Amino acid sequence: MGLNPPFDKEGIYIVDGKLHVIGPRYIAMVANALANETRARILRYIAKKPADLDELSHIVGQSKANISSQIRKLENVNIVKAKYVPGTRGIRKVVELNVNQIIFHIADPEKK
């Protein structure tokens, strides 16, 4: 039984707040982004509420530069999204979840 569009080819798709991951390359990319304790802690925290880099740095106990790098890896696979908002001292980068569920499609999308 094949998958319906947009799931008829490999890639990363967001549908109704769910991240659908299809194909070995993309599964490995998303799994790699999730396979880090710091990134897991960030995800658990922002699942409750969006947070800026200062807040995440304090919660996780790492530098803002490292947090920014970790966020970029999660952004690259569409798990989180960041926006820039005015703060009391300039612009703040606020991070929030982009999806509420991740689904790995193991079967070959071209099999019918």
Give residue spans per PLM region:
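Short, Lys/Arg-enriched N-terminal segment that forms or immediately precedes the first helix
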Residues: 11-31
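Short helix-coil-helix linker/hinge
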Residues: 32-38
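Pre-recognition alpha-helix immediately N-terminal to the DNA-recognition helix
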Residues: 40-44
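Short capping segments at the starts of secondary-structure elements
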Residues: 48-54
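Alpha-helical residues within the helix-turn-helix
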Residues: 58, 75-76
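Glycine-centered, phosphate/nucleic-acid-interacting loop/turn motifs that mediate DNA/RNA or nucleotide
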Residues: 78, 84
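Conserved segment of winged-helix/HTH DNA-binding domains
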Residues: 87-112
